[in-house]
Amino acid sequence: MIAFANAFPYFEKINTSLLGLSIDSNSSHLAWMHDIYCMTGIVLPFPIIADRNGSIARKYGMISNDISNTETVRNVFIIDEKGIVRVILIYPMNIGRFIPEILRIIQALQTSDCSSYPIPAN
């Protein structure tokens, strides 16, 4: 989440909202956000949803029962303004997300939505 916070201005520049979700409690989120601030000075500039019963996480396939039925896996969902899930990225718990690739995907989707040209690699 720190990487997303650091890249927040780039997401804003491409008209993209960020939202975090976990099945931890509000108090757990507040303590975690406080720890991040105390250790790094970073304030998370986007909301974090406390999905206590896991209903949202289950609907989006974020809980891998073969790993744990109480922890979400690291997912990134790119959802367009119509509410359509356009991209799902699933990361192992021990691998961080690659923010430049996420930004590239969003920009590629935005560009391809406005033209009939495919977006090349790299």
Predicted stretch roles:
Residues M1-N122:
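Chalcogenol-based redox active-site neighborhoods
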